[in-house]
């Protein structure tokens, strides 16, 4: 007997099949695409720049902090600047690579224990107008990094940005600020300050929570000679501004225990505060594909396990560049990322039979060790920043901006106040009681507090939520698992996701596909006409749409309920 409501055989059409798809046109992605295409492999190179300004407004994929100028909405101008800022795109295009700009990868799918209907592994792609599926034989993930964001009083104001967000805006000449305070004095912080000066910005402060500055002393002196003032043993007391935008930052000195020293406040005029405390590898697509990830604090967090060709445990999937680990070498020099890209591109070509093994091995030997080079662990440093911010700013600071979840609500495992919901039972619980129930994880906290459930999809709060959980549990942050990732991994409008007319199968079987209770009624015992069935799931016999369920709910075949 055939179940007409089954989804098997009803998948959306696959528009194209490509032997090798590269996601991310940074140093690693471009190098991989060039290596493979020169071996005779058909290559598609995907990059989401120029970004949809609506995504930028949601701080996706970087923390832009509403500091984009109006030029960011001029797509033709932005396309020109993206190509100008990345000469590798032109080289790839001339070499025969199919370069897809302004395209986001919102999903990655392959057959597995719970999914068997796909013809092969596919990517979900989208631009501002439409969405489509592309099948691949080999895939390289070169998606780079995310900004690590740790909050402070006033961090929800426009003008608080991340190092990646600032770098993207200045590189494409759409940054709408002038005076910049940088948080963090390590290689990333110093590089951010240097690039800001080169872009014609004024760097009014570099702030460091530790007593010792962390970056290269030579570069530190150079910046100081150019008028940059450094503030060791300081943290942010508050970002201030009367119009919802940053107008100044107040710093406060810390003692050896990271406690604030009363009367040591310093207010500095600025319109932008840049978080340059660190970066985290972008592993969402790798997680979707089931690649094995392991925690490495010296590489920025969870990173993929790779073999000698930078292949992952997911069949046919490679990883290269910053998404395999962030360390000092990659911050200072993208040559490491380029080497990784070449190696991964060569590995993909070899696995496709496009290059003989002897030649591939020779090139790999020439490249030498291009894997991630360990540096010092970073999470202890981030914990210093978080602890100092809690001591200075307290628990009424947002831990999650999108859902307006405060630190107090996170620790108390309470939903955000805007919901107007209270439960005496839940009020008696908190992280402490959850810990007694078993290992804690971010998915659990997301469901109970909504932290990480907003449109930025946890990009602004993921690390600080993990740090909070580790602090409360008294465990290393590496024991806090990553949250689950599900498609779409980019905010996506329904109009873009499915612009076509609703197919007949969806019209006939939406009751089953959308998880309505009657899906459990066997299809051979009754047929539910979706157009004639209204389902109400309110509690206590009350319809969710007002009135009583007796008045509005039709009898559902096979349930015995009226």
Give residue spans per PLM region.
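Residues forming the flavin
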Residues: 2-448, 453-455, 459-468, 472-498, ...
């Amino acid at each position: 007997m055939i179940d007409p409501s089954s989804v098997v055989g009803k998948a959306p059409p696959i528009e194209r099949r490509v032997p090798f798809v590269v996601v991310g046109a940074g140093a690693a992605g471009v190098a991989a695409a060039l290596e493979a295409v020169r071996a005779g492999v058909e290559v598609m190179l995907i990059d989401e720049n120029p970004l949809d300004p609506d995504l930028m407004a949601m701080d996706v994929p970087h923390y832009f902090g509403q500091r984009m100028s109006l030029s960011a909405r001029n797509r033709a101008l932005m396309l020109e600047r993206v190509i100008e800022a990345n000469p590798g795109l032109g080289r790839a295009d001339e070499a025969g690579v199919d370069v897809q700009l302004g395209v986001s990868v919102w999903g990655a799918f392959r057959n597995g224990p719970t999914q068997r209907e796909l013809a092969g592994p596919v990517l979900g792609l989208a631009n501002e107008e439409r969405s489509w599926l592309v099948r691949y034989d080999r895939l390289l993930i070169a998606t780079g990094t995310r900004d690590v964001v740790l909050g402070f009083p006033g961090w929800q104001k426009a003008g608080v940005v991340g190092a990646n967000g600032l770098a993207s805006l200045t590189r494409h000449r759409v940054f709408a600020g002038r005076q910049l305070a940088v948080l963090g004095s390590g290689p990333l912080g110093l590089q951010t300050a240097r690039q800001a000066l080169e872009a014609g910005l004024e760097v009014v402060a570099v702030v460091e929570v530790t007593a010792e500055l962390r970056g290269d002393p030579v570069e530190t002196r150079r910046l100081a000679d150019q008028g940059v003032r450094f503030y060791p043993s300081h943290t942010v007391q508050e970002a201030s501004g009367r119009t919802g935008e940053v107008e100044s930052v107040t710093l406060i000195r810390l003692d050896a225990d990271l406690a604030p020293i009363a009367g040591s406040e310093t207010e500095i005029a600025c319109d932008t505060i840049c978080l340059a405390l660190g970066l985290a590898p972008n592993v969402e697509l790798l997680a979707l594909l089931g690649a094995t990830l392991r925690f490495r604090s010296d590489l920025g967090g969870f990173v993929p396990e790779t073999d000698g060709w930078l292949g992952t445990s997911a069949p046919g999937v490679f990883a290269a560049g910053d998404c395999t680990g962030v360390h000092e070498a990659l911050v200072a020099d993208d040559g490491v990322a380029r080497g990784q890209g070449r190696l991964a591109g060569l590995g993909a070509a070899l696995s496709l039979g496009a290059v003989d093994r002897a030649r591939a091995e020779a090139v790999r030997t020439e490249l030498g060790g291009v894997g991630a080079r360990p540096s010092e662990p970073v999470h202890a440093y981030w914990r210093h920043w978080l602890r100092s911010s809690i001591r200075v700013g307290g628990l009424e600071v947002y831990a999650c901006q999108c859902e307006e979840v405060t630190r107090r609500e996170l620790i108390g495992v309470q939903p955000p106040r805007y919901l107007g919901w209270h439960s005496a039972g839940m009020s008696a619980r908190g992280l402490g009681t959850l810990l007694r129930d078993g290992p804690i994880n971010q998915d659990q906290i997301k469901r109970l507090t909504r932290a990480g459930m907003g449109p930025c999809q946890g990009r602004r709060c993921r690390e600080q939520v993990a740090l909070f959980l580790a602090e409360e549990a008294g465990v290393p942050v590496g024991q806090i698992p990553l949250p689950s990732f599900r498609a779409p991994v980019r905010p996506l409008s329904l109009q873009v996701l499915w612009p076509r007319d609703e197919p007949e199968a969806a019209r006939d079987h939406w009751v089953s596909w959308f998880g309505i209770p009657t899906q459990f009624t066997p299809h051979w015992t009754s047929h539910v006409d979706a157009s004639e069935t209204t389902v109400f799931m309110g509690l206590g016999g009350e319809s969710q749409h007002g009135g009583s369920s007796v008045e509005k709910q039709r009898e559902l075949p096979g349930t015995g309920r009226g």
